C-alpha cells in the first residue's frame, strides 16, 4: 500500500467523522472545488424517479450545501463506517446507515461509497451504491427497516 493510498483512506475516515459531528468546514477543506457528486451515473433511475435531494447530481463544491442541508433534515439513528479500502486514487467505504426522513419514512441500508481523489489528496468525485428501491420507499414515507436488512 502506498502512502497516497493510506492518506486517501485516512481522508475518507476523517470525512465521516466530520460528517457525524456536523463539521462542514473540515469536510469542505477535503473536497476539491470542481467535485462531482453523484454525477457520473449513465442512467440512475432513482435520480429520475423523484429520489431525495441529497441523491441528485451536484457539480462543484459550492453546490454541496444542497446535499448537507437535505441530509441534515434526516434524523440519524446510525452512521457506522465498517471498512475503508483504498487503492491508488480511489477509496471505497462500506457504511451502515439508518435514519428517519422528513416524510416519516425510515431507511436502513448498508452502502458502498466510492471516493476519487486528485493528486493533492482532495475528493474530486463521490458515488453512492445503495438499495435505491428502499431509498425511494422511505422517501414516500415507508418504513424500510421491517425485517432483516
Regions found by a protein language model. Give the residues of each.
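A beta-strand edge to alpha-helix "cap/lid" segment located at domain peripheries
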Residues: 2-7, 69-149
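Short glycine-rich loop/turn motifs that provide flexible caps or phosphate-binding loops at active sites
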Residues: 21, 59, 103
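Short N-terminal micro-motifs specific to bacterial/archaeal maturation
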Residues: 3, 18, 54-55, 126
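Hydrophobic pocket/interface hotspot
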Residues: 12-15, 27, 35, 60, ...
Amino acid at each position: 500500500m502506498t502512502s497516497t493510498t493510506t492518506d486517501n483512506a485516512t481522508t475518507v475516515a476523517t470525512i465521516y467523522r466530520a460528517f457525524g459531528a456536523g463539521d462542514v468546514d473540515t469536510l469542505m477543506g477535503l473536497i476539491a472545488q470542481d467535485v462531482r457528486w453523484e454525477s457520473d451515473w449513465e442512467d440512475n433511475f432513482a435520480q429520475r424517479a423523484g429520489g431525495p435531494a441529497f441523491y441528485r447530481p451536484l457539480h462543484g463544491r459550492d453546490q454541496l450545501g444542497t446535499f448537507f442541508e437535505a441530509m441534515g433534515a434526516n434524523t440519524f439513528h446510525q452512521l457506522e463506517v465498517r471498512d475503508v479500502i483504498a487503492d491508488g486514487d480511489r477509496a471505497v467505504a462500506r457504511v451502515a446507515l439508518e435514519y428517519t426522513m422528513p416524510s416519516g419514512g425510515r431507511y436502513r441500508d448498508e452502502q458502498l461509497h466510492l471516493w476519487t481523489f486528485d493528486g493533492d489528496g482532495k475528493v474530486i468525485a463521490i458515488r453512492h451504491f445503495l438499495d435505491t428501491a428502499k431509498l425511494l420507499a422511505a422517501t414516500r414515507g415507508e418504513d424500510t427497516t421491517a425485517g432483516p436488512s
